[in-house]
């Protein structure tokens, strides 16, 4: 399977981004709609992944100007650590281009081991958000600049 990853503005790609996030976050994770679709989407840099054969959206992610990475969603039939790593690589590259000092995200506890392979470190206390135990994880941009991420596919 081949796919394309693009940076997209919310204004042009909102229906495609929303379709993935609705299926993953609202239907599967039972995140309330008003939590999933906040007022930060317009200011974020968004990633959209589409299946090259069907042209359908299959994954999303976003980074805010303050360095917060969030809304990483991959449709169930397309889930693989490889795809999530590629989404993260594009988001981290965007962070470098935004000249951020660090990035952070509020990860589910079960995902922290995976994100540690992307140079993230857990900080602070565990808390509940939308019924999921989470913890803040951070990554200094210097470690991203020195990491070797391949964006080929």
Question: Predicted regions: what is each one?
Answer:
Residues 95-108:
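Conserved GNAT acetyl-CoA-binding A-motif
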Residues 48, 54-73:
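Conserved beta-strand in the GNAT
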Residues 80-93:
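Conserved acetyl-CoA-binding loop-helix of GNAT-fold acetyltransferases
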Residues 21, 114-116, 120:
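Conserved active-site tyrosine of GNAT-family acetyltransferases
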Residues 43-47, 70, 133-137:
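Short beta-strand micro-motifs in enzyme catalytic cores
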Residues 1-39, 46, 50-58, 141, ...:
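Short amphipathic alpha-helix that is part of the acyltransferase structural core
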Residues 106, 121-138:
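Conserved catalytic-core motifs of GNAT/GCN5-like acyltransferases
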Residues 72-80:
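A short, internal acetyl-CoA/4′-phosphopantetheine-binding micro-motif in the GNAT/acyltransferase core
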């Amino acid at each position: 399977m081949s796919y394309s990853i693009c940076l997209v503005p919310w204004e042009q790609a909102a229906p495609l981004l929303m379709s993935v996030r609705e299926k993953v976050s609202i239907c599967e994770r039972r995140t309330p709609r008003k939590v999933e679709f906040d007022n930060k989407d317009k200011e974020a840099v968004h990633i959209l992944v589409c299946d090259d054969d069907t042209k359908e959206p299959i994954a999303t992610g976003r980074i805010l100007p303050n360095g917060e990475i969030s809304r990483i969603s991959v449709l169930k039939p397309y889930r693989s650590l490889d795809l999530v790593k590629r989404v993260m690589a594009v988001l981290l590259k965007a962070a470098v281009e935004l000249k951020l000092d660090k990035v952070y995200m509020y990860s589910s506890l079960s995902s922290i081991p995976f994100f540690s392979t992307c140079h993230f470190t857990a900080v602070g206390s565990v808390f509940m958000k939308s019924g999921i135990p989470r913890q803040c994880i951070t990554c200094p941009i210097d470690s991203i600049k020195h990491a070797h991420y391949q964006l080929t596919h």
